[in-house]
């Protein structure tokens, strides 16, 4: 099985920390979202992943589909920070 690599950046932190995650193509993207959130200590239930262009990603897909459609460079947004000042 082929693997895909995602670079996920935490946008709510001014230092913009990131994690590189390698998973198989058939891994559900919800698992990638949950793992990334655990790495950044943010709640996965209220977080979203977007592209660098600001387009939201539906996590109910395989990691391979997300990689093909959106590439490897993604951003994590804890939803409690969305729209806040």
Curated annotation (Swiss-Prot):
SUPFAM superfamilies from the UniProt entry: Ubiquitin-like
Protein name stated in the entry: Ubiquitin-fold modifier 1
GO biological process: protein K69-linked ufmylation; response to endoplasmic reticulum stress; reticulophagy
Stored InterPro entries: Ubiquitin-like_domsf, UFM1
Pfam family, one: Ufm1
Keyword Phosphoprotein on entry: no
Propiece span(s): 84-85
């Amino acid at each position: 099985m082929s693997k895909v690599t995602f670079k996920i950046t935490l946008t709510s932190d001014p230092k913009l920390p990131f994690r590189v995650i390698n998973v198989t193509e058939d891994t559900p993207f919800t698992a990638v979202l949950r793992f990334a959130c655990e790495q950044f200590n943010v709640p996965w239930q209220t977080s979203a992943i977007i592209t660098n262009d600001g387009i939201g990603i539906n996590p109910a897909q395989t990691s391979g589909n997300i990689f093909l459609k959106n590439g490897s460079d993604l951003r994590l947004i804890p939803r409690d920070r969305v729209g806040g000042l």
